[in-house]
UniProtKB/Swiss-Prot annotation:
InterPro entries in the cross-refs: PRC_barrel-like_sf, PRC_RimM, RimM, RimM_N, RimM_N_sf, Transl_B-barrel_sf
UniProt function note: An accessory protein needed during the final step in the assembly of 30S ribosomal subunit, possibly for assembly of the head region. Essential for efficient processing of 16S rRNA. May be needed both before and after RbfA during the maturation of 16S rRNA. It has affinity for free ribosomal 30S subunits but not for 70S ribosomes.
Domain PRC barrel: 94-168
The protein's name: Ribosome maturation factor RimM
Family of this protein: Belongs to the RimM family.
Classification via SUPFAM superfamilies: PRC-barrel domain, Translation proteins
Organism of this sequence: Rhodospirillum rubrum (strain ATCC 11170 / ATH 1.1.1 / DSM 467 / LMG 4362 / NCIMB 8255 / S1)
C-alpha cells in the first residue's frame, strides 16, 4: 500500500486568470480538496488547491500564486497526491478498500491464467466498476466490483481474483485516459460522504 494517494492530475489551464483544469480521481470530484493540501509526485511542492467549479470530466481549480495562463500551463501534467495519514484512521470497514490500493494490482481468473491489471475504478451510479486492462493488449473490460465477480481481494498480497460473467469479456474497449493524454495510474476514490473508501458489495 502506498503512503501517498493519487487524487488528481492537472490537465491544462482554464481561461487567462490562472485557473487550472484538474481530472479528479475522487469518487466525488468536488471533494478533491476536502482532506487538506495536496502535493506533487516528489512531495516537495504543496498546493492549497481551491475547487471553484465543475466542467465536463474535470474540476476547475485555483492555486494560490498561479495568476495567469502561462503559469497554469506550466503545471500541466502535474499529478496531485494526498497523504494517507490525512484520511480518518477508521475509514475502512470490512470489504472496503481505497481505490488507490487497487490500481495496478494484477487480476487472475478463478480457473487460472491472468486476466489483466486494474487500470482504474469507476462509479457510474450503480456501484463500483473495475476497469481492467487485459493482459493480451491495450484493451480493457469493466468488471462489477462485487463478491460474485471479484471473489478475492488481497491487497497485502497484491492480487485480485475475478470470475467474469459469461460473455462479459467480449465487451472490450480502449482504456480511459484524460483527453488522450493521461493514461497512467488513475488513483484513489474517496466517497462523497467524506470517508475516503470504496468496496465490494
Amino acid at each position: 500500500m502506498t503512503e501517498r494517494l493519487l487524487v488528481g492530475v492537472i490537465v491544462g489551464s482554464h481561461g487567462v486568470r490562472g485557473l487550472v483544469r484538474v481530472k479528479s480521481f475522487t469518487q466525488d470530484e468536488m471533494a478533491l480538496c476536502d482532506y487538506g493540501p495536496l502535493s506533487d509526485e516528489t512531495g516537495t511542492r504543496r498546493f492549497a488547491v481551491e475547487v471553484r467549479n465543475q466542467a465536463k470530466g474535470v474540476v476547475i481549480c485555483q492555486i494560490p500564486g498561479v495568476s495567469d495562463r502561462t503559469a497554469a500551463d506550466a503545471l500541466k501534467g502535474t499529478r496531485l497526491f494526498l497523504d494517507r495519514a490525512a484520511l480518518p484512521a477508521d475509514a475502512l470497514e470490512e470489504d472496503e478498500y481505497y481505490h488507490a490500493d487497487l490500481i495496478g494490482l494484477p487480476v487472475d481468473l478463478v480457473d487460472g491464467g491472468r486476466l489483466g491489471v486494474v487500470h482504474s475504478v469507476h462509479d457510474f451510479g450503480a456501484g463500483d466498476m473495475l476497469e481492467v486492462t487485459l493482459a493480451q493488449g491495450r484493451r480493457s473490460v469493466l468488471l462489477p466490483f462485487t463478491k460474485a465477480v471479484v471473489p478475492l481481494v488481497d491487497v497485502k498480497a497484491g492480487r485480485l481474483v475475478a470470475d467474469p460473467p459469461l460473455g462479459l469479456l467480449d465487451d472490450t474497449r480502449p482504456p480511459a485516459g484524460v483527453e488522450g493524454e493521461v493514461e497512467e495510474d488513475p488513483g484513489v476514490g474517496i466517497d462523497e460522504d467524506g470517508d475516503g473508501k470504496g468496496g465490494a458489495s
